[in-house]
UniProtKB/Swiss-Prot annotation:
The gene is lpxB. HAMAP family: LpxB (MF_00392). This is Lipid-A-disaccharide synthase. The lineage of its organism: Bacteria, Pseudomonadati, Pseudomonadota, Gammaproteobacteria, Thiotrichales. It comes from the Bacteria. The keyword Transferase applies. Condensation of UDP-2,3-diacylglucosamine and 2,3-diacylglucosamine-1-phosphate to form lipid A disaccharide, a precursor of lipid A, a phosphorylated glycolipid that anchors the lipopolysaccharide to the outer membrane of the cell.
């Protein structure tokens, strides 16, 4: 069996890593190849191109690096047309993967898109391309199946999110603090996750550090910890080493899972990390900034959308504070961080609600995906 997979960024690599591991157990002799990251490679995946080349965000970044992406996309399409997989799975990265899927489906290759494009937020017209590109959408959020069914008469299959299964409902934080060498710490632990892409980290890290400095100046005592999302971010972190050191922030060259599981509270970028923090039952403050042009065009396309962070989307209310674009200022971050430290009753409520959502999301994701995959292959 030959299976093609393309994951476009770290969150896709996390999903792909557990999926490739499960596929290898089910089909030990399968060739599984395409584009992936370190977690997928560790599970036995062969990456034909570096995943980092696809990890872009915002219109300016796409314009500046778009030609390389288009070149890689054309090469991967040609490769799979010449080395036809039994099935192709595009993990997230819809602007890249839907075109790949459409091209491969046109020559008779079965395609799956894993992680629905957020057409319920913006660019809903993409449903036309989705219909042409993919045989199945695998949804990771519970409400998406009804959205596709009721609004577009298109089948999306809820497979859950592997993080919901892999992260325990009740976390032994002491275990992860010991693992990170924080055994003797008696202060509240605040995890700081400014993103995984160079562009977002360069915008958010300086703001986050200044807000934390104001928190320290106001007399708040805490221990801040921060994961290094990937080695390529080291030069950027080094640029802010003096501030990081003066705040006593420990930077760990480990995945975000361990850092979040060791934490009491979190300050982080909007994105998949907010889902992970929610599953770790962390009250949090979310911030995000795009380039001005990306933000302008994005707002023109999106309009007034209520929520950006996964916890708010899933809870259908602003259960945690999200500070987006011009609201993402040092003063606003500082104000919300103070509330995070001061309002224990609110934090207890947040933890209770996160636990409810987590229980609803638990499903054996990989087994469900393999079941869908088997059915599609048998019918072909």
């Amino acid at each position: 069996m030959r299976i093609g997979i393309v994951a476009g960024e770290l969150s896709g690599d996390q999903l792909g890593g557990t999926l490739v591991e499960a596929l290898k157990q089910k089909y030990p002799n399968a060739i599984i190849e395409g584009i992936g990251g370190p977690k997928m490679a560790a599970a036995g995946f062969k990456s034909l191109y570096p995943m980092d080349a696809l990890s872009l965000i915002g219109f300016l970044e796409i314009i500046s690096k778009g030609l390389r992406i288009l070149s890689i996309r054309r090469k991967i399409i040609n490769y799979f047309k010449q080395n036809k997989p039994d099935i192709f799975i595009g993990i997230d990265a819809p602007d890249f993967n839907l075109t790949v899927e459409k091209e491969l489906r046109s020559v008779g290759i079965k395609t799956i898109h894993y992680v629905s494009p957020k057409i319920w937020v913006w660019r809903e017209y993409r449903i036309k391309k989705i219909r042409k590109a993919t045989d199945k959408i695998l949804a990771i959020l519970p409400f998406e199946t009804e959205y596709y069914k009721n609004r577009h008469k298109f089948e999306a299959i809820y497979v859950g999110h592997p993080l919901a299964k892999n992260i325990p409902i009740h976390i032994d934080r002491t275990k992860y603090r010991d693992k990170l060498g924080l055994k003797g710490n008696s202060l509240p632990i605040l995890s700081v996750l400014p993103g995984s892409r160079t562009t977002e980290v360069s915008r958010l890290l300086p703001l986050f550090l200044l807000a934390l400095q104001k928190l320290v100046d106001a007399g708040y005592k805490f221990k801040a910890i921060m994961p290094l999302a990937k080695p390529s971010l080291k030069p950027l972190f080094a640029k802010y080493k003096e501030q990081i050191d003066s705040l006593g922030i420990e930077v760990f060259e480990t995945n975000s899972h361990d850092v979040l599981k060791a934490s009491d509270l979190s300050l982080l970028a909007s994105g998949t990390a907010t889902l992970e923090a929610m599953l770790c039952k962390l009250p949090m403050v979310v911030g995000y900034k795009l380039s001005w042009l990306s933000a302008l065009i994005g707002r023109m396309l999106i309009g007034n959308h209520s929520y950006w962070a996964f916890p708010n989307i899933l809870h259908k209310s602003e259960i945690i504070k999200e500070l987006i674009q011009e609201d993402c200022t040092v003063d606003n971050l500082f104000s919300e961080l103070k509330r995070l430290f001061d309002d224990k009753q609110r934090n207890d409520y947040i933890v209770e609600e996160f636990e409810k959502i987590h229980k609803e999301m638990v499903i054996d994701t990989e087994s469900k995906i393999i079941q869908v995959l088997n059915t599609m292959i048998e019918k072909s």
